[in-house]
Amino acid sequence: MALQDLGENLQPWCPLGLSLEWVKTVWDLDFTEIEPLDPSIVGEILETGRDAFTKLYGSLFPFATDESGSLESIWTFFTENDISSNTLVALFCHFVQEAHKKSASAQYREYGLHAAGLYFLLLEIPGIVVNQVFHPVMFDKCIQILKRSWPQESNLTQKRKKDHSKSSKDNYRKSRKRGKPPRKEDYQVDELSREEEEEEEEIYFSGRDLCQIRDAIFNLLKNFLRLLPKFSLKEKPQSIQTCIEVFVALTSFEPIPHKFLISQARNLNEVKHISELAYYGLYLLCSPVHGEENKVIGSIFHQMLNVILMLEVGEGSRCAPLAITSQVINCRNQAVQFVSSLVDELQASVYPVLGTLLQHICAKVVDKAEYRTYAAQSLVQLLTKLPSEEYATFIAWLYKYSRSSKIPHRVFTLDVALALLTLPERELDDTVSLEHQKFLKHKFFVQEIIFDRCLDKAPTVRSKALSSFAHCLELSSSNTSESILEIFINSNLVPGIQNLSNTVLNPSPVLTSRNGYSAQSRTHNNDEQTLPGERCFMTMLRKRIKDEKINVRKSALQVLMSILKHCDILSMEQDLLILQDHCRDPAISVRKQALQSLTELVMAQPTCVPVQKAWLMGVIPVVMDCESTVQEKALECLDQLLLQNIKHHKKFHSADRSQVLAWSLLALLTIENQDLRRYLNKAFHIWSKKDKFSSTFINSVISHTDTERSAPAWMLLSKITCSSPKLDYTKIIESWERLSREQSPNSNTLGYMLCVIGHIAKHLPKGTRDKITGVIKAKLNGFQWSPELISSSVDALQKLCRASAKTVLEEQGLLKQVCGDVLATCEQHLSNILLKEDGTGNMDEGLVVKCIFTLGDIAQLCPAIVEKRVFLLIQSILASSAHSDHLPSSQGTTDALDSQPPFQPRSSAMPSVIRAHAIITLGKLCLQHEDLAKKSIPALVRELEVSEDVAVRNNVIIVICDLCIRYTVMVDNYIPNISVCLKDSDPFIRKQTLVLLTNLLQEEYVKWKGSLFFRFVSTLVDSHPDIASLGEFCLAHLLLKRNPTMFFQHFIECIFHFNSYEKHGQYNKFSQSERGKQLFLLKGKTNKEKRMRIYKFLLEHFTDEQRFNVTSKICLNILACFTDGILPMDMEASELLSDTFDILNSKEIKLLAMRAQTSKDLLEEDDVALANVVMQEAQMKIISQVQKRNFIENIIPIIISLKTVLEKNKIPALRELMNYLREVMQDYRDEINDFFAVDKQLASELEYDMKKYNEQLAQEQALTEHANATKGPEDSDRVPSAQVAPDLEAVPALAAAPMAAAAAAAPMAAAAAAAGQDNADVPPTQSRPSAPRSNFTPTLPPISENGPLKIMSSTRPMSLSTIAILNSVKKAVASKNRTRSLGALPFNVETGSPENPSSHESSLSLEKESDRTVNHVTKRAISTPENSISDVTFAAGVSYIGTPATFFTKEKHEAQEQGSDILCLSLLDKRPPQSPQWNVKSPARSHGSTRSSRRSLRKAPLKTAN
């Protein structure tokens, strides 16, 4: 029966007109190329449509499932009826191939799926002929139709599909490595895909079509899975690979709504989703039937990798990242779940393959934050399936991976470590080796992976590591959080950490290196060089907080906040201050992070007063930030902690931490941090515009005025009423009446109350206003209130009078009426004290202060009623100076100031506190009366210089600066006197002057004239670090913004000014007083570091254009002046040139475009940053070429010429020139070679000079190291008796005549001693060989008569020749205790007695320098003989006679060497003999060429050293 049905259903598939040749061709071509089938035959087959496939399938199905019985054989039936299986397969292939086309209709796609199902059914039928039916290409096509028959992205509109394709390609191109253009093949593939898309756009699929195709795919897949267990693919690896690719692609075909388990998919009849069938197909492929397990599983995992990493999957896929949607995430979760199930079932056999998968996840994860996070979660989830031994092995590999040279690898390791920390810690297992047991502990992830990455050289990695630390400490799992804290505690990483039970754990406060070993052995190529102490967590964190990269600082602040949450704040107040200071960080995002961190910290520790104060000092001033987003963040933090927690006092609960915190903060603002209240005015003004203060809120504040929180409540009301005066006035007036009657009211509360009354005055009834006015007037008349309340009282009086008056004139009349009596009382009281004989003897100091203060405030309100008598009274107070008689007059004042007498001389002496208040009052009077100001300003300036009282000087500065706004021209002449206060002995005065001058300069009341700029920038090197920091802020962030060229315009003159060089015709020519010069003196070697700090600060804030121009200006205005002989070459010039070359050699003067490294670790999602890098590289190339051209054409010629001049004059600045020349020869080697191409001899000389100079530096460094290594313990307690400068001039590479060079050392020493005596008492700072200082001239004390001179270890290394000559001097002095006589020298040296230290300094300098050149160790120049000209002795009364070099026998030579420690000097009346000329001819001269005068000067004949 089955065979009969089969015969009927096979009829359409056995058309009579079918060409056997066509069938043969299909098989011969291995199904790769199929010729079109005759349409009539196709029509004959499809006459019944889909039934042709389904009926044949129904007929064949019983034979595949053995339902037809064993008596019937389909293959026998085929043979008997002459039915060819090859023909059937060829016809099936035709329909399969048609369905593969993108232009295929829904019907043909369905036909193709059915045809593939018939082919699989033939393979399923048992029998020997099955091997003839199978063909690998046909098999693969039938499998691939499962994927290709489904219309691509059919659920999208055509436009959306086109846009997505374009976007996907764009994203792929963006993800390509920069600088690597797409290949030609990529463009060709793009063209093909574009054509295919256009073809596909013409096809429309209805919902019904899609459902039919989906059902056909489902049925075909189910049938194929029924075939897989029966049909082995063991010998068909390509078919297995095709199956895996198709199955993996189908896993994301449709979502699986329920939790997927492989065991459920084994019953195919119960499976409803294609994705489930695909996973079951992958599971079936893992059967031993299809080959070696691990190979197949490895291929499956390889394909599943893209699903897990959320990349494109499929044939021809470029593995571009997919948009992260819920469907993509679900596919990832299902893939991880499948791999986990497979590992659970196969156990140990699959562990190696799983390890490979985990490694590939690490290596191929997309370098974007979200992809990394999901990949790390997947990896950790799979890692839990491994037993401890394999787990530890993988962690060991991960640890090595964390030290990869690629930044994305190191970043992803941190994601993995963070994910692993969320898991419970594994217990130790006996199967794990001892060396691998550490990998099971959380401590390893924290200390060995995350901590080490905090020291990474890449800022992206450092930032990620710090963020990981912060996340560790904020983990929601209490167990994990405790374990992290436990790691810190046990490692002594952080002092005073609190555990979660709020108990304070205080390990050793000493921050030691963790694990007790040195960090130097742990450094890696990807890590920064760390010192032994930097392995401590807090040391590292403090360094990261100062990191140059913004994201690193942000992350470090997060970590610091997390640490402080769990710490004893009292032991970490310095770190709390760091968090506070970063609210003013230059970077906007860092400021926001600091605000957020401080807010979170104060909410975590609401009862900690230091944290509360830090929050106030950090957050409140930021409401004035110039960046609106930062300002909004600060307002948000204030609103969150202050306003939102203010409730009615009936709802106040001490257990409510937020309410308690709000009132605690307000109380601190009221009492301790009153200076911050001015910033609150800005905040409340902004809030009032937003209608922030409702009547409910205001009434809630008022309800606290009668509680213990009254002072902060009144303070808050004073801010609110300024903008929202809708208050319950009755309650306020009642409180006023009660408090005003008290004998000693609280000053703070009463002051705020007066402020509130002033704001609501216009809303009060007239009777109430008059009553309050009377009370205030009476209190002022009786001086019953403290000075703190006087200003508030006067302000309240003014507002009350304004509220009572209808016009301005009426207001003035009321003020005169009210204030006139108070003013008269003050005048009478002062007259009684100052004009009566015994007035000062019985005066009440506090009462006088109140009187003076009241008078000043009243005078400002009513200047018309103030009589001249009041002026005289105030002036008489100031005239009574207790120190005006004995203090010398300042030398730095103008003639008018010198002749200015004290205000009005008087014999009485007033206390300083009264004089200080009198100055403030005088300033208020001067603001209203110009004539008084003209008389008072010179006297005030005089007082500024002679007064010893800090309060008096401070008030004088404030008054003069205020008067500068009112009378700018009048005060302008005295700005130099004010700027002198920048060097006042008191730090407070210096800081006050700095702030006031900054304000005046910002508003342009004061101009940068004369010495003001140079005095202002000298604050950068103030001895007080806070003042230096404030100076930096004022200059860089306030003043430079108003005048961007300010630094550039003054830079050249800075070099002259700070070296006190006044020989230039243009620079440093402004007038200065001697006192000012001495106060701001920065010349000399001792101040070299300070000067360089100023120069570098200015250069750091130059633009690249300014750096380029200032380099040229330095060469033209400084260096060229010396090469052209405009300026004299002397010791003053040496200091100036030394500074100049150090500036040119500094990294700060190099163009940013040239010294900035292209960022290799851009932020992941920042495509704009990538474009910026490309622009930066192009800009750098252009600027570099311009800079190099300018350098070669304009700078190098000047440098070379100046080198010759310095060598000729033996100037110590030659050392700095050589340093600079060495650097530029490295930076511009090719350009310099081109420059010297025309003068190869000069080039060889310069190269030789540099070689010898480098050798000398290396020799000095070696000697220093040797001296440090051999120095005995007793040497450390000795005080060095001599500081020996390095031997610069003795090196033949720097001078053609080395002995003449040594001879020039003594006048330099003498000149230095005369010009820079301020350096004698200060030891020179230690210098490094790579960047030596210009400490050329040694300073030696006189030789002791009791013993030989002892040379101790100096701060600078000594050459071998120096050591030799000093040893000779020591021996000579020890053996001959008698007076030495000096012969005539070929240059002028001041001689003196042995008791004169300067005499010894000069002579010893001479001896030291001269012997350096004689010593045989010294390297010789090109034209210098190897042996010395003659032996030199050191003895009295022996004259020198020059003789030609003589060759001795061995005995005579040994005899000569016995006296080698004797030095002989010529007599004063003798001229040194000329040395013999060397018979050496230059090849260049032999051809008649003449050398330049400059070169002939360099190669002068040798002179004798004496």
UniProtKB/Swiss-Prot annotation:
Stretches of the chain forming a coiled coil according to its record: 1213-1270
CC annotations in GO: condensed chromosome; condensed nuclear chromosome; condensin complex; germinal vesicle; kinetochore
UniProt repeat feature HEAT, residue ranges: 442-476, 532-567, 574-605, 968-1004
Polar residues compositional bias, start-end: 884-897, 1324-1338
Pfam family, one: Cnd1
Start-end of Low complexity biased regions: 1393-1405
UniProt KW keywords: Cell cycle, Cell division, Coiled coil, DNA condensation, Mitosis, Nucleus, Phosphoprotein, Repeat
Location of region: Disordered: 154-194, 884-908, 1317-1353, 1385-1412, 1473-1506
Annotated localization: Nucleus
Protein purpose: Regulatory subunit of the condensin-2 complex, a complex which establishes mitotic chromosome architecture and is involved in physical rigidity of the chromatid axis. May promote the resolution of double-strand DNA catenanes (intertwines) between sister chromatids. Condensin-mediated compaction likely increases tension in catenated sister chromatids, providing directionality for type II topoisomerase-mediated strand exchanges toward chromatid decatenation. Specifically required for decatenation of centromeric ultrafine DNA bridges during anaphase.
Entries under PANTHER family matching the protein: CONDENSIN, CONDENSIN-2 COMPLEX SUBUNIT D3
Protein's UniProt name: Condensin-2 complex subunit D3
Organism of derivation: Mus musculus (Mouse)
